[in-house]
Amino acid sequence: MFTLKKPLLLLFFLGTISLSLCQEERDADEEEGEMIEEEVKRSLLGTVKDLLIGAGKSAAQSVLKGLSCKLSKDC
């Protein structure tokens, strides 16, 4: 019985270490994936923001042109 305890203890110890290393690597991969998702979200939000700003500028320009036309009565 004593002869089986040492190898089993060694296997348990090595298994625990390898499991711990795998868990650390998995956590690192998940953090990297979260960073990539944040970058994609930021780039999408930046693109949408730029489109909305451009649309707002063009709408404001057309409103101002219409107002200036009505005020100067050159329409």
Curated annotation (Swiss-Prot):
The keyword Disulfide bond applies. Expressed by the skin glands. Keywords: Amphibian defense peptide, Antibiotic, Antimicrobial, Cleavage on pair of basic residues, Cytolysis, Disulfide bond, Fungicide, Hemolysis, Secreted, Signal. One of its GO terms (cellular component) is extracellular region. Pfam families: Antimicrobial_2, FSAP_sig_propep. It is found in: Secreted. One of its GO terms (biological process) is defense response to fungus. Residues 23-40 form a propeptide. InterPro entries: Antimicrobial_frog_2, Frog_antimicrobial_propeptide. Residues 1-22 form the signal peptide. It comes from the Eukaryota. Disulfide bonds join C69-C75. Belongs to the frog skin active peptide (FSAP) family. Brevinin subfamily. Has antimicrobial activity against some Gram-positive bacteria and fungi but has no activity against a range of Gram-negative bacteria except P.faecalis. Has antimicrobial activity against the Gram-positive bacteria S.aureus ATCC 25923 (MIC=19 uM), B.licheniformis X39 (MIC=37.5 uM) and R.rhodochrous X15 (MIC=9.5 uM), is virtually inactive against E.faecium 091299 (MIC=150 uM) and S.carnosus KHS (MIC=150 uM) and inactive against E.faecalis 981. Active against the Gram-negative bacterium P.faecalis X29 (MIC=9.5 uM) and is inactive against E.coli, P.aeruginosa and S.typhi. This is Brevinin-2HS2A.
